[in-house]
Swiss-Prot record:
NCBIfam families: PRK05452.1. Anaerobic nitric oxide reductase; uses NADH to detoxify nitric oxide (NO), protecting several 4Fe-4S NO-sensitive enzymes. Has at least 2 reductase partners, only one of which (NorW, flavorubredoxin reductase) has been identified. NO probably binds to the di-iron center; electrons enter from the NorW at rubredoxin and are transferred sequentially to the FMN center and the di-iron center. Also able to function as an aerobic oxygen reductase. Binds 3 Fe cations per monomer. Binds 1 FMN per monomer. Pathway: Nitrogen metabolism; nitric oxide reduction. The gene is norV. In the N-terminal section; belongs to the zinc metallo-hydrolase group 3 family. Fe cation 3 binds at residues 469, 472, 502, 505. Keywords: Cytoplasm, Electron transport, Flavoprotein, FMN, Iron, Metal-binding, Oxidoreductase, Transport. FMN binds at residues 260-264, 342-369. Fe cation 1 binds at residues 79, 81, 147, 166. This is Anaerobic nitric oxide reductase flavorubredoxin. One of its GO terms (cellular component) is cytoplasm. InterPro entries: Anaer_NO_rdtase_flvorubredoxin, Flavodoxin/NO_synth, Flavoprotein-like_sf, Metallo-B-lactamas, ODP_dom, RibonucZ/Hydroxyglut_hydro, Rubredoxin-like_dom, Rubredoxin_dom. It comes from Aeromonas salmonicida (strain A449). Residues 30-210 are annotated as: Zinc metallo-hydrolase.
Length: 521
């Protein structure tokens, strides 16, 4: 199957509708992908790239149906990775003497993959060109570490087509080839996901290389990528997007991700997110469980965010393995211009949060105060989690916020008596300075005991006052009671049995707090 691209250029690649894992299992390709190969018929016949090795035989058969293989004068390999040059062994078995134009680094990579050092390699560097007849040339532009050392782009004069390799692409399979034929929102989401998960570590190189290419003052009528769609409608839009994404990109967005053994850390995440929204309703907040959500989606959200909160239960005095794995990914991606903080619950020791803080600092994040809760957080501990969210919302705000109103009246100097072993600890590394979280300012670490029975507001609790579940927002109305749990209508909250469980989330009385009038309407 071939698709006409422009003038004497045809797409001869391969769609892969079924692939769901890329680079091993590192990249989830929920939309499939394509391996784009292009055949140019001018005075010389030129093949740009091949396809993934698993489609080698099919690719060569289809190519042979389109053109006499012996008439191919030149093969250009922009990238030696197997999803670009994977069919070379099958193809070169049919046309063994055909010259292969690639970078010097690509010769090593291709030889290492295919083990044919005798192939007719022609190394090129930036500015080298190849006359292909009819007044047209191919101009080569090295792009090392975008995203391999061997990478390059190829520009075709007169037709003004940039064969851009992995840059500007996306793992996105569609029956259409061009950007103006597909869903624009979905397309841009896949472009950003691709950039965030693959090219982010090389952002400084992206900026420098794009500026170098633009400095050539070459017209670009089309960007022909190695994966996904071809940009023919306003192709500069994706180039400008790359410049934006490469420039310490952030949106007014906060991402929380966590893993939890007993839902305690999840409860903290929910409460922190509630506190953020109370202070800054305009900020976008996303919460992910790393054990259940798509890793690449989480990484994309981290890329988009101004701030990240990472939570974990403590297991064997360290963080949960999936959180550790995610932090390793984040360290490698080298995100910049982002704030971060750790949180989590623990039992007898709380090593996870401290380790997360250290890893975030090592990854280049601007660290804010961390938060720990001992055992299952009760209503007062969750109130502190919400206050923690409020304080982070203020610290991380990208725009002026309304002046905060006091919420927590508990102080470290006059802490209530610990009734159930619930302890909230807030800590901050020395490099983060002194941060206020609704308690006296401090650096280092401190433990703040929290009583189960202390309401986090200054209002008195009336017998007929509704109670709000801080986890799922279900409201207990004393006038209605809860007949399914044998709580009769007219039963005040103080007389509801301690065995009561929230009908919405199944958690006990400790997560309820007096419901503000406006919230209960």
């Amino acid at each position: 199957m071939t698709i006409h691209v422009k003038n004497n250029i045809h797409w001869v690649g391969q769609r892969d509708w079924e692939v769901r894992d890329f680079h091993g299992t590192e990249y989830k390709t929920h939309k499939g992908t394509s391996y784009n190969s292009y055949l140019i018929r001018e005075g010389k016949n030129v093949l740009i790239d091949t396809v993934d090795h698993k489609f080698s035989r099919e690719f060569v058969q289809n190519l042979a149906a389109e053109i006499d293989l012996a008439s191919i004068d030149v093969i250009v390999i922009n990238h030696a990775e197997e999803d670009h040059a994977g069919a070379l062994t099958e193809l070169m078995a049919r046309i063994p003497g055909t010259p292969i134009y690639c970078t010097h680094n690509a010769i090593d990579s291709i030889t290492g993959h295919h083990h044919h050092p005798e192939w007719n390699f022609h190394p090129v560097k930036t500015g080298d060109s190849l006359d292909i007849g009819n007044g047209k040339q191919l101009v080569f532009i090295e792009t090392p570490m975008l995203h391999w050392p061997d990478s390059m782009m190829t520009y075709m004069t007169e037709d003004a087509v940039l064969f851009s390799n992995d840059a500007f692409g996306q793992h996105y399979c569609d029956e259409h080839l061009f950007n103006d034929e597909v869903d624009q929102t979905e397309l841009m989401e896949q472009c950003q996901r691709y950039y965030a998960n693959i090219l982010t570590p090389f952002s400084p190189l992206v900026t420098a290389k794009i500026k170098e290419v633009l400095g050539f003052n070459l017209p670009v009528s089309m960007v022909a990528t190695s994966h996904g769609i071809v940009w023919r409608d306003d192709p500069t839009q994706i180039i400008l997007k790359y410049l934006e994404w490469a420039d310490h990109y952030q949106e007014d967005r906060i991402t929380l991700f966590y893993d939890s053994m007993s839902n305690n850390t999840r409860m903290m995440a929910d409460a922190i997110a509630q506190g953020i929204h109370e202070v800054d309703p305009g900020v976008a907040v996303k919460i992910y469980n790393v054990a259940r959500h798509d890793k690449n989606e989480i990484l994309t959200q981290v890329f988009r965010s101004k701030g990240v909160l990472v939570g974990s239960s403590t297991m064997n005095n360290v963080m949960m393995p999936k959180v550790a794995g995610m932090l390793e990914e984040i360290t490698g991606l080298r995100f910049r211009n982002k704030r971060a903080s750790a949180f989590g619950s623990y039992g007898w020791t709380g090593g996870a949060v401290d380790r997360i803080q250290t890893r975030l600092m090592d990854a280049g994040f601007d660290i804010s105060i961390s938060l720990k809760a001992k055992w299952r957080p009760d209503g007062s501990a969750l109130a502190l989690c919400r206050e923690h969210g409020r304080q982070l919302a203020r610290q991380w705000a990208l725009h002026p916020l309304e002046a905060p109103c006091p919420i927590i009246t508990t102080s470290a100097a006059a802490a209530p008596v610990v009734e159930a072993g619930v302890v909230v600890e807030m800590s901050v590394p020395a490099s983060a300075g002194v941060v206020e979280v609704g308690v006296p300012a401090f650096s280092g670490a401190m433990e703040l005991p929290v009583s189960r029975g202390v309401a986090p507001t200054t209002c008195e609790q009336d017998d007929d006052q509704p109670m709000l579940c801080t986890v799922c927002q279900w409201i207990y109305d004393p006038a209605l009671g809860e007949p399914d749990q044998l709580v009769a209508p007219g039963t005040p909250w103080a007389r509801v049995p301690d065995s009561f469980l929230c009908p919405g989330c199944g958690i006990g009385k400790e997560v309820f707090e007096p419901c503000a009038v406006e919230a209960c309407v």
